[in-house]
Amino acid sequence: MSVARIGRGAALVCSGLLAIALAAPLGAAAQAPSNPSLNAQLLVGARQGDLAQVERVLAAGAVPSSRNRLGKTALILAAEKGNLAIVEAMLKGGADVDQASLEGVTPLMAASYAGAAPVVQRLLAAGAKTDVRDRMNKPAMVYAAGQGGAAAIDALLASGIDVDAAYEHGLTALMWAAGQGQADAVRLLLARGARRDLRDDRGLTAADIARQTNHLDVAEAIARP
């Protein structure tokens, strides 16, 4: 699936476009060849959540950095499914915690999108970088705020990310969460001190963005002192 470029104007915060922009890099994994090598078996095991297979082929010499046709490693496949056990196995086996897919999606971004807070925490503990951006210029926090939810956001904030950091087009995490109607994420961000008065490069606040995307309850929660 191609990734739609996030434009300016009201369509920027449209729920559909945000979902496409976030979800496209996380498409389905490639099918394994009919006579899979150890590396292919590693990818299949990670995709299917088969810890025993992952551990077996790693011990037999599978390369942790092996990638499928989308450039996804076994660590990314495990992270986007929130499979902490396989994430642990891959890290123990020497996987690069920041190796990205062809779309620039890192394991941390994949876990953040999935809302897999335990995996986010484990990747951060392993040294995953929070400031890396994908080919659409989105860091892990945008994946968490736009889709992953409060627990993933909280894990990222605990690593020291500024709650009011502005990303592409001046959008903060609060604005992304508001545009997607992520009420729990909005409440969490406000509780962590996110500013309601900040504006994106169109002059819109998070509450304005929530209204544009018809998330009126979220807009009200943001506007409420």
Segments from the language model and where they lie:
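Ankyrin repeat A-helix N-terminal signature
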Residues: 44-49, 77-83, 110-116, 143-149, ...
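Leucine-rich solenoid repeat scaffolds
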Residues: 190, 196-225
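Bacterial N-terminal signal peptides
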Residues: 13-24
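Intrinsically disordered, low-complexity regulatory segments in ankyrin-centric signaling systems
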Residues: 2, 27-60, 69-72, 92, ...
